[in-house]
Amino acid sequence: MTPSDESKALVRRLVEIVNARELEALDEVARGQIAEGARAWIGPFRDSFPDFRMEVVDVIAEGEKVVGHFKCSGTHQGEWRGNPPSGRRFEDVDEIYIFRVEDGRLASATAVVEDNLTRLRQLGIEP
């Protein structure tokens, strides 16, 4: 496996971990601060959207950088951003992240696109 393939595999494994709610496994793929940050948002977000899923659309790697494009979906079943549960779903919401790999694990993650406007509209929440 090439270094680029290994980096792409890290991002795909990250998505598996998020989808399976295996937050303790984040340390396999991410360095300390990134793993802690992911736990900090995944837990509460999963409380609001228990069936939240990420689908990998594409993963591109070059050098230490990896770009992941994902489609996300979930049903609003818990309070989120002060909004009570609506029971409505968001589907196919685009998210694009740039990751940096260091010593075989994700060392940084930058959200380039998180289409929260589409997510809010599908949930019936005024932006």
Predicted regions and their residues:
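C-terminal and inter-domain tail/linker signature
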Residues: 1-127
